[in-house]
């Protein structure tokens, strides 16, 4: 899984080096990034299906590909942070998660090839950055000390009004709110203690699958905003933080 992420990321890193030259043409840059996204997913599909021929594959670009082994599914986002990539902002990631029937997500990888931050997790064994650094959520207990990450609904996405209400409720109580543009990295950064919490609505399973397990294995809590844990991997509307901050943030979001 890690090697597949690295190989797909190598192609993205090469393509990222060319993006700046295309900024003169919005359409040119957009088409280039779309092709980079598709190429990265094709690389992941080929490598993962070769390694585990029977497993299913759910990718952002190709959708669901059924496997003969109905108990295992790869969940893949080849390029989370597409808009950042298109604007030559070095904050994006390749994401792979493995879902097992009856157990949920059992392993995952989130990799930013530009910073070489490789976050990985295995159920029951912990979450890590690189080879050795164990991830733990931040220990802050008070909202006025906390920095939160979120995602802002953009063109064509629903929920602008609700987001502004939530931002109003949350921002009055916290030390800061950040919007970096890649949900998978936001979750990894919460797991690593860089951010204290992350919330966002209208996500997809490939945005969050690896991050869900990272939060859990780093001692954090992740639920949907309505606290229905059973469908948190489906993305939708999630809140991730440490155990102490979670109810405090949830209270602010529900007041919106």
From Swiss-Prot:
PROSITE patterns: IMP_1, IMP_2
UniProt-listed Enzyme Commission number(s): 3.1.3.25
One biological process term in Gene Ontology: inositol metabolic process
Superkingdom to which the source organism belongs: Bacteria
SUPFAM superfamilies: Carbohydrate phosphatase
Residues that hold substrate according to the record: 60, 79-82, 178, 207
Cofactor(s) listed in the protein's UniProt record: Mg(2+)
InterPro entries, alphabetized: IMPase, Inositol_monoP_metal-BS, Inositol_monophosphatase-like, Inositol_monophosphatase_CS, Inositol_monophosphatase_SuhB
Binding site for Mg(2+) 1: 60, 77, 79
Keyword Cell division belongs to the record: no
Residues that hold Mg(2+) 2 according to the record: 77, 80, 207
UniProt KW keywords: Hydrolase, Magnesium, Metal-binding
One GO molecular-function entry: inositol monophosphate 1-phosphatase activity
Catalytic activity: a myo-inositol phosphate + H2O = myo-inositol + phosphate
Family the entry assigns: Belongs to the inositol monophosphatase superfamily.
Protein name: Inositol-1-monophosphatase
């Amino acid at each position: 899984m890690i090697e597949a992420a690295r190989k797909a990321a190598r192609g993205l890193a090469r393509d990222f080096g060319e993006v700046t030259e295309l900024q003169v043409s919005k359409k040119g840059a957009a088409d280039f990034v779309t092709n980079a996204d598709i190429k990265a997913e094709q690389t992941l599909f080929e490598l993962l299906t070769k390694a585990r021929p029977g497993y299913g594959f759910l990718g952002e670009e190709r959708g669901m590909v059924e496997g003969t082994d109905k108990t295992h599914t790869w969940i893949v986002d080849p390029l989370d942070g597409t808009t950042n990539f298109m604007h030559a902002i070095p904050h994006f990631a390749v994401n792979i998660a493995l879902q097992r029937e009856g157990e949920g997500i059992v392993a995952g990888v989130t990799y930013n090839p530009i910073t070489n931050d490789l976050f990985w997790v295995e159920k029951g064994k912990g979450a890590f950055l690189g080879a050795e650094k164990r991830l733990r959520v931040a220990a802050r207990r008070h909202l006025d000390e906390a920095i939160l990450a979120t995602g802002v609904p953009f063109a064509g996405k629903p929920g602008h009004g609700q987001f502004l209400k939530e931002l109003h409720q949350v921002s009055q109580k916290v030390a800061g709110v950040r919007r970096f543009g890649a949900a998978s990295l936001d979750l990894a950064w919460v797991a690593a203690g860089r951010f204290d919490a992350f919330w966002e609505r209208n996500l997809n399973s490939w945005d969050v699958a690896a991050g869900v397990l990272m939060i859990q294995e780093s001692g954090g809590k992740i639920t949907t905003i309505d606290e229905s844990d059973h469908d948190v991997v489906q993305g939708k509307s999630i809140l991730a933080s440490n155990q102490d901050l979670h109810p405090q943030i949830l209270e602010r979001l529900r007041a919106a």
